[in-house]
Structures are given as C-alpha cells and as structure tokens.
Amino acid sequence: MPFPVSHVTSQSVAPGVAHYVVRSPQGPWTINVLSVDLDRCNVAEAVKGSDSAAGRYRTTALLAQLATHEKVVGGVNGDFFVLKDGAPTNLLVVNGRMLTPPNGKPVLAFDSAGVPHILAFTLSDGRLEPFHPMEAVGGRPIIVSDSAIDGAVDTEGNPGFRERNPRTAAGIARGGRRLYLVTVDGREYQNAGMTLRELGAFMLALGSRDAINLDGGGSTTMVYADPDSAGRLRIANHPSDKGGERTVGDALAIVHACGRTSQH
C-alpha cells in the first residue's frame, strides 16, 4: 500500500534493530519506527517497574531500570492504565508472571519461543487461555488483521480514536519474525497525529500482517539506544504533554539478548 513520504532517516541501534524517522506532508506527520528482527537475538520484554500492578513511571525510567541488567536497545509505552494508581487496564505479563488479568480486549503477547501474537486472552480456573505468554502488554483495538485494516478502527467506543491524536502501535510482519514499534507525534502545529484508520494504513505500508494500537495521546513515547552517544537511552519522539514525558502504567522494551543465559 503506498504511503506519502517526504523524508526518511535511518540508523542501526543494534544488530537487527533499526530506528527510522519518517516525515510525511499528508498530516503533516512525524513518525518514529523501531524495526526489530527477532531472529537476531532481539527479544521483547514487558516492563512495569514494580512487583505489583500499581505504580506510574516514565517510559525512560522503566527502560533505564531494565538496562541495569539487560542490553536495552529501545522501546515504547504500553497499555492504557488507571490514572489514579497506574494499573494497566488489560493483561500484563512480565517474565511469565501475570500482574493484571485479561479484560477481553486484545494484547500483544510473546510465547515461550519469543514468537509475537496479537489476540485476546481469557482466565479459566486461574489459567490463561489459549496459552500462558512469557510477556504481554495490552492495547485496543486491533488495527490490522491478516494484512487488512481491521473494522475496529471505526467502531472503537472512544471518540478520540477516530480523531487525530498522538499514537503508539505495534505490528507483526508477515512471517512473524519482525516486530514494528511505532509512534506518531501529534497535538502540534507541525505534527497532526493520526486517526486509527490512518495508523492502520501506515502499519500496512510498513509490512504489518497484524497490528495493535497501544496507549496514545500524552502517553506516546519511544526510546532508543543512541549509537552516537554510546548507546545512551534517548527519547525519539516529542511527547505532547506540556510537562514533557508522561508517567505511564507499563512499557514494552526491546532487549538485545545474545549471550544471555537466564531470564530477566
């Protein structure tokens, strides 16, 4: 699917992980993309920052905490959350441990082999079905399904989803071994944000077979390991809150895990 682009810059942040900045006059839009080859020792890890469901932290702080014992090369904010206490609204699984239960909405989940899936889970007799993921971060709705824009982009109950706003999304490429993490800046004169349908069109243009919308608006944040600063974690996008980066409920990190002998 064609997508209008005026300028693209790219840099490698780790073996198999590239950071792209895409500019389009159509919005206008500034879009950040992390393209992750899951066959190059790169794994996705959900990050909470505490051992309980509650708590709000900046995405940079969550990834920096993980970076004390893992080689974090990038990541984005995760699920929608309860403003009062920071608890994610959907399933959160960190290193195999369920911190919040499923709510019937879809999640981005990774099985024991690190294979990504976008689907809804149920809880039956204390067991997650259809399988117990190693990592899972919630979102809503599914925006691309089987290489087509999903009808949910026009039916999701929140009116803001049908308006242009900052966005965070995750996509799985055809074949299932490449992951796309995407942020779209918005609420600025030079950056309009996207509707979910526009976001779905971009995820398709990237090559996503399936994609899910994550928490957006002021929560939208992408972090990457800057190769020009010895891998220091930096914010790639422009968070839209006046105070800068928002505290969020959870995040999704990309870790370069070659040589790792144990789980985080």
Region spans (language model):
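Zymogen propeptides
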Residues: 1-108, 115-119
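Short, conserved active-site entrance elements at the starts or edges of catalytic domains
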Residues: 133-158
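Short, structured patches in soluble enzyme cores that scaffold and shape functional sites
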Residues: 112-114, 120-122, 139, 145-148, ...
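Loop/turn elements at helix/coil->beta-strand transitions in domains of secreted/extracellular proteins
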Residues: 69-73, 115, 148, 175-179, ...
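Conserved, well-ordered active-site substructure
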Residues: 85-103, 110, 158-174, 178-209, ...
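Short, glycine-/Ser/Thr-/acidic-enriched flexible segments
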Residues: 26-29, 39-41, 81, 115, ...
